[in-house]
Amino acid sequence: MQRHMLKSKIHRAAVTHCELHYEGSCAIDEDLLEAANIVENERIDIWNINNGERFSTYAIKGERGSGMISLNGSAARRAQLGDLVIIAAFAMIDEQELKAGWKPDLVFVDEDNKIKGSRDHVPTQNWT
């Protein structure tokens, strides 16, 4: 059996550009793509923390070290400059990989979309 699992996440990145008339996609700083294990043309889901919008597009490379998160084409209508977003990618993982210890790549960024940390799991949520 295979399970549809979170593979990659860039958490709380700020939108730096909205390019309505650019060919659709989301341009992401190449440093962030590599850290999160997202490849060019991979399908990504984007969740806008500010307005609750959730949509899918695909990733393209943004300038390395720029902190770029550019929503292009129709995706540009889903956010404003400065909105915080979560960018996620999913993969089909088989039971053997899961039992062998497969983990996702989670990347956390600062206010300039520079990497401030990474993890391979989401901590258990507590009620305290």
Curated annotation (Swiss-Prot):
Any idea which GO molecular function terms this record carries? Answer: aspartate 1-decarboxylase activity
Q: Which SUPFAM superfamilies match?
A: ADC-like
Cofactor requirement: pyruvate
Q: How is it modified after translation?
A: Is synthesized initially as an inactive proenzyme, which is activated by self-cleavage at a specific serine bond to produce a beta-subunit with a hydroxyl group at its C-terminus and an alpha-subunit with a pyruvoyl group at its N-terminus.
Q: Which InterPro entries match?
A: Asp_de-COase-like_dom_sf, Asp_decarbox
Q: What role does this protein play?
A: Catalyzes the pyruvoyl-dependent decarboxylation of aspartate to produce beta-alanine.
Give the similarity note. Answer: Belongs to the PanD family.
Q: What is this protein called?
A: Aspartate 1-decarboxylase
Taxonomy of the source species: Bacteria, Pseudomonadati, Pseudomonadota, Betaproteobacteria, Burkholderiales
Gene that encodes it: panD
